[in-house]
């Protein structure tokens, strides 16, 4: 199940701004991985749970759209298309962030 996906309009595909955003998201994910224990201790009370439970939850999250998640997204689009809520989609379109 893909809970959230960063999406952009087609006209920003391949732009320097998109590449910059992509790099910032990767840097943020890396920074969080280096500081997750401290953050769990700092914010456990805010979330009303022990820090080890919060840390375990955070570490259970995945940030890559693997094949299974991509198939789930396509299934979601197919269901939406069957209700005339979205156009049929045969494949997930990917933005060009490396070719800038």
Question: How would you name each of these model-derived features?
Answer:
Residues 3, 9, 25, 57, ...:
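Aromatic-enriched hydrophobic runs in primary sequence
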Residues 81-100:
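Long, low-complexity C-terminal extensions of enzymes
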């Amino acid at each position: 199940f893909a809970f959230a996906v960063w999406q952009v309009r087609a006209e920003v595909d391949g732009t320097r701004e998109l590449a910059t955003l992509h790099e910032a998201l990767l840097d943020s994910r890396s920074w969080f991985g280096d500081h997750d224990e401290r953050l769990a201790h700092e914010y456990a009370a805010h979330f009303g749970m022990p820090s080890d439970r919060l840390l375990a939850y955070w570490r259970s999250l995945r940030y890559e759209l693997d094949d299974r998640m991509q198939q789930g997204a396509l299934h979601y689009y197919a269901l939406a298309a069957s209700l005339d809520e979205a156009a049929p989609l045969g494949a997930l379109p990917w933005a060009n962030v490396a070719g800038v």
